[in-house]
C-alpha cells in the first residue's frame, strides 16, 4: 500500500504541474533539455551530421512551436526530443517513469514479453540434464550479488556437467564487475576490448570532479580529470586506452561447450559481456530469437539537469565507444545471436527451466 500511495502522489504531482505551468515555463524546461543535450551529450556529433542537420533543426523548431502554442508540455516534448537520438542512455524521467521510452522510433521499441508470458527472469543455478548446467544471470546491478555469481560457478564446476548455459535474458546491464567471473570461466584465448572517449565539455568535467571527490579521489579518476583539464580544446579524450587486452593466467578445462541465451531486453553492460566473450571464447555460442537492444555505444550516464518547472530529470551519457569514430555502431542493430531459436516464447521465464533452455541444452549435446 505504501508503494501505491507513492505512485499516486507522483501522478497527482505531475497532473498539478501540467495544470499550473505557464507556456513560458514549459518553454524554459524544453530549452534546457536542448541546451544540455547539444552541449554535453557524447552522441550528439555522431547523431546529428551533415545529412540530417536540417531535419534536426526543423524537428527542434516544430517541437518548440508545439510548446509555444500550448499544445504540448515541456516535459513531454523534451522526451520526444531526446527520443530523436534513439539512445536508451539519453532520457528524461519523472517520478521514476521513463518519459523518453514511449517516443522511441519503431526499430528501438522494447517488446513487452510480459504481456504474453510470465516474464520475470530470476537467478538460478541447476542442472538441466546430466551433461548441461544452467546459470540464469538476469542483472548486472547487484541482484544477483558477486558472491552469488561466484557460488554459481562453484556449483557448476562441482556438478560434473561438460556444458554450461548462461541465460542473460532480461539483463539490462549495470556494472561490468558482476559478469567478469563468467568471462574468466569461459575465456580460452586472449582478446581485446575497445575503450571509450570522454566528451570533454565543461559540465561533464565538473561532474567527473564531483564523482571523484565523492569517492575519495581514486587515482584512475584523478588521472582522467588531469588529462581532461590539459586537453580542454579537444572535444573527445580517450578515457584509458583505445583498446585493452583481455588475458587471464589460466584456461578452465570446463565447460567444453558454453551457450549464452539472449533476448531483446539485453543491453548496456550485458552487451559488453557478449562483446568480450565473442573476443575471448571460441567455445561460447550465443542463442536467441531477437538481437539485443543496442544500448552500448554511448555510456557513463549522469543526471544532467532537473528541469526547474516540471521537476523531471534529464540524464545524459558522457562517453562514447572508440568504435564510433571508426563508423561502427552496435546500437543501430544490437548484437545478433549466432543461432536463432525458432520456438514460440516460453510459457514463463522465472526461476524454472524453460523450453528454450531445454532446447539449447539438447543442441549443445549434439555430437
Locate the predicted segments by residue:
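Flexible, low-complexity junctional segments that flank or bridge functional domains
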Residues: 18-224, 242-243, 254-259, 272, ...
Amino acid at each position: 500500500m505504501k508503494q501505491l500511495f507513492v505512485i499516486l502522489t507522483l501522478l497527482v504531482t505531475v497532473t498539478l504541474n501540467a495544470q499550473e505551468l505557464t507556456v513560458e515555463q514549459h518553454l524554459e524546461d524544453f530549452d534546457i533539455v536542448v541546451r544540455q543535450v547539444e552541449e554535453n551529450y557524447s552522441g550528439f556529433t555522431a547523431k546529428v551530421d551533415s545529412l540530417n542537420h536540417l531535419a534536426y533543426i526543423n524537428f527542434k523548431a516544430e517541437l518548440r512551436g508545439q510548446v509555444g502554442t500550448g499544445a504540448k508540455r515541456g516535459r513531454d516534448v523534451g522526451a520526444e526530443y531526446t527520443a530523436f537520438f534513439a539512445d536508451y542512455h539519453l532520457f528524461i524521467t519523472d517520478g521514476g517513469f521513463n518519459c523518453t521510452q514511449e517516443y522511441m522510433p519503431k526499430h528501438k521499441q522494447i517488446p513487452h514479453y510480459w504481456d504474453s508470458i510470465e516474464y520475470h527472469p530470476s537467478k538460478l543455478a541447476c542442472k538441466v540434464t546430466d551433461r548441461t548446467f544452467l546459470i540464469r544471470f538476469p542483472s548486472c546491478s547487484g541482484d544477483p550479488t558477486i558472491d552469488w555469481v561466484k557460488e554459481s560457478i562453484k556449483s557448476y564446476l562441482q556438478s560434473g556437467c561438460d556444458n554450461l548455459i548462461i541465460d542473460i535474458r532480461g539483463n539490462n546491464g549495470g556494472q561490468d564487475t558482476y559478469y567478469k567471473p563468467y568471462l574468466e570461466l569461459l575465456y580460452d584465448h586472449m582478446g581485446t576490448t575497445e575503450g571509450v572517449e570522454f566528451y570533454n565539455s565543461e559540465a561533464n568535467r565538473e561532474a567527473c570532479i564531483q564523482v571523484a571527490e565523492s569517492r575519495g579521489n581514486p587515482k584512475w579518476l584523478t588521472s582522467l580529470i588531469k588529462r581532461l583539464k590539459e586537453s580542454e580544446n579537444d572535444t573527445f579524450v580517450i578515457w584509458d586506452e583505445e583498446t585493452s587486452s583481455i588475458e587471464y593466467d589460466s584456461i578452465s578445462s570446463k565447460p567444453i561447450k558454453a551457450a549464452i541465451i539472449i533476448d531483446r531486453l539485453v543491453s548496456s553492460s550485458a552487451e559488453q559481456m557478449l562483446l568480450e566473450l565473442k573476443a575471448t571464447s571460441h567455445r561460447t555460442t550465443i542463442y536467441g530469437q531477437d538481437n539485443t537492444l543496442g544500448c552500448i555505444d554511448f555510456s557513463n550516464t549522469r543526471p544532467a539537469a532537473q528541469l526547474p518547472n516540471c521537476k523531471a530529470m534529464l540524464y545524459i551519457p558522457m562517453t562514447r565507444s572508440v568504435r564510433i569514430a571508426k563508423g561502427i555502431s552496435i546500437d543501430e542493430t544490437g548484437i545478433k545471436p549466432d543461432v536463432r531459436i525458432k520456438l514460440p516464447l516460453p510459457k514463463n521465464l522465472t526461476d524454472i527451466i524453460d523450453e528454450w533452455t531445454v532446447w539449447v541444452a539438447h543442441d549443445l549435446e549434439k555430437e
